[in-house]
Amino acid sequence: MKELTLWIPVALSVIGLLFMLYKFLWVKKQDAGNEKMQGISKSIAEGAMAFLSAEYRLLFIFVIVASLALFGISRIVETTSWLIVPAFITGAIFSGLAGNIGMKVATAANVRTTQAARTSLPKALNVSFSGGTVMGLGVAGLAVLGLTLFFILFSSHFIVGERSFSEEMVFALEALAGFSLGAESIALFARVGGGIYTKAADVGADLVGKVEAGIPEDDPRNPATIADNVGDNVGDVAGMGADLFGSYVATVLAAMVLGNYVIRDYVEANGTAFVDNFSGMGPVILPIVIAGVGIIASIIGTFLVRTNKSDASEADVQRVLNLGNWSAIIITAVVTFFLIRWMLPSTIYMDFFGEGILEVASINVFYASLIGLAVGGLISAITEYYTGTGKKPVMNIIKNSSTGAATNIIAGLATGMMSTFLSILLFAAAIWGSYELAGFYGVAIAASAMMATTAMQLAIDAFGPIADNAGGIAEMSDLPEEVRERTDVLDSVGNTTAAVGKGFAIASAALTALALFAAYVTFTGIDGINIFKAKTLAALFVGGMIPVVFSAMVMQSVGKAAMEMVQEVRRQFREIPGILEGTGKPDHGKCVEISTNAALKEMMLPGALTIVTPILIGFFMGAESLGAYMAGVTVSGVLWAIFQNNAGGAWDNAKKSFEAGIEIDGKMTYKGSEAHKAAVTGDTVGDPFKDTSGPSMNILIKLTCLIGLVMAPILGSENSANSDMATIDQSNEIHVETIDEEGNIVYDLGEMIEIELPSGEVINVGNKSSEAKINDFMSSAWVNGNLVNQQSNWITLDRVYFKSGESRMLRNSMDQLKYIATIMDAYPEMKIKIGGFTDKMGDEERNLKISSDRANFVKDFLEREGVQGDRMQAEGYGPQQFVCAANDTEICRAKNRRIDIKVVLS
């Protein structure tokens, strides 16, 4: 069944790619207009492909260097195979291919949309949205196909039965992480490079053309016009395609990694192998199958994006786009319900931090997926509210434009900042809700379900720049005003859908980062992030700072490139006679060259910052500090992404409103007015916000967490080495009392011995360990069949530790409690009293509660291990019965913070 199931997403991805090909050929068959229109379109296509070719040549060198580094890691880390290298290279190639497909269809669809707009708006919508559909299905189809084929290869190679299933699956998924790392690495440079290109051209064209010369947008007299239209493709098409390709892959990968831990937790909780109809890997392959189903749901959704109204308004176009989107979401939700019922057992087990392994009904996983799908829809609604034409926030910016550029910018900044409120509350509720339902696996499935309709989301998003280009071609070709009016309707909706698409990308980055973070914590074996450690807190602050510095670097790059563009456009207006009169021909090629060179040069430093910083943090500060750094980048990055995306989108639509004519204080205000010029300035500031630094935050977040995940085996092996050293220290004849990094006492466990219990079970423990003391008591309690000792003294559990100030037990404590459960199973007459104790630090009442919670946590854990509840009592004593009366040193206080048990016989 596993083999058949794994080929289902392959088949679904192939269907998606075939439908993509059909749509691409349909677009190419449409009328491309007159010779002048085709010439302009050809210039845009040549400029776009020239940039991509130059960018890919640079990235080829990066891929070679990164591949060699990954190969070196595979030689020194046991769980990392050399197969991570071909996976990385293929991920990079597929990411580049996804962007290339989008570029090809966008530069073919733009002029055909213009020609269709000469006939009717519905036909123009059909052509532009079909172009977007090609982009969406190309990204989704390649992502699912690549992931599934590599997983089939790696699972067959690594899962051979020599180790436990989950251990062997770790090898397969670690190699598969290379595919995701390759995709995100290329996406970073495509997003940053494309963003710098497009905004250098856009800002330069607007500042000199609109503000100084007073000529319309996309006027053929503007030397930067072609570069501006090329930029729409390299930034909003190729860049967005690579971005969502990376998100798609990373989300599914994170869910697969956490699915493997669901299998491991099931085995730990039940002591038996995980059995299902999919060779015991249902939780791992479920996310891929959901992704495949999302492709088909998206195809169905595309058929609903139609309108018959020749005079359709922006609201009408937005309505049919929303219909297609929500239809795809609902279809995915319904099919996901049946997939979960089919692929997961009715009950699964998961490790909840602070609570141990708990039983979870598999229907909860479905509820978590509904949360993810709802987030995808709701974030679109929130973004549309803050950036949509006619909505209150945009109208407020329009009103503030009447008093100048300064008040316009203040209003735009406030709109972006305020937009974080609802978005972050939505993310927080989604994370909390999905975690409560089904742990981190629930969070990952929520993200996977949301990303399942990526093909539809990207189709909606990519149609925007196609419509924008179509309007530019109409303007440069001197087509009738009615054609530009139709393309402006699509362009205005496209601005909102672009902002919505960026909001969707932010939501995916937030949920994906959390899922990757959970996988990282499990991979490294750390028990959480303790911010009371100076080193960890320092890394958290550095992580929070990185998105701010990254944004600054990108904004400076745009400013520098835009300055060159402004100077070049001014030079041409000054030196080439007749440009403004329409008799001279501007040198468009020079502006394209400036944008290309600036983008390629300026994208390297932000890229290096993103990749090198987490590597340095991990190697020099350790696993826990890298985890804190990842958390800092994620929280700060999400906030900055929302702020910049929505501020830029709102500024853009405020400017667009003036071009159509808008009423301010009872008076109509149009293009060319002082208020319009203020709005143009605001839009110019917002352009790099929404199209360069804002979207780059998503990849910064995901790539940081992916690098952490790839480094996790190295850092995890260091943690293991440290643990081994601690064990060696404990077995020395002379034991020096120490405390570990968490502040827990390291006890002398003595020499390792085998203890055979009456049940026949054998446990391997130290001869001075708690288990040895309990067994010694039980062995000596009877003499000649008579009970001579009814109760032991308190025995401290020497390897049961809790998070400081919490009732959350550290994961490495579970082994000792499992041994205690085994001993109690061997001695059915044995009962125990569990006591929780603390030191005197802090509030006494709180200490008493913590000690009680810890004692009850141990009791609950032992019950889950099969010990009957009536054989145990639990009580918290707080700061009482010190074993170290002075309570004046760290070691002394660590001894007093403990869990003791007292054996009772009757």
Name what the model sees in each region.
Residues 1-729:
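Hydrophobic packing and interface segments
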Residues 40, 565, 813-816, 854, ...:
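Hydrophobic alpha-helical membrane-association signature
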Residues 46, 461, 740-742, 759, ...:
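Acidic/polar residues in short coil/turn loops that connect beta-strands
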Residues 50, 819-823, 861-862:
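A generic secondary-structure signal
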Residues 107, 799-801, 836-840:
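Short, histidine-centered active-site or binding-site loop motifs used for metal coordination
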Residues 483, 696, 807, 840-841:
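Short strand->helix junction
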Residues 725-831, 905-906:
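Periplasmic peptidoglycan-binding/tethering modules of Gram-negative envelope proteins
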Residues 746, 808-812, 827, 835-906:
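Periplasmic OmpA-like peptidoglycan-binding domain that tethers envelope proteins to the cell wall
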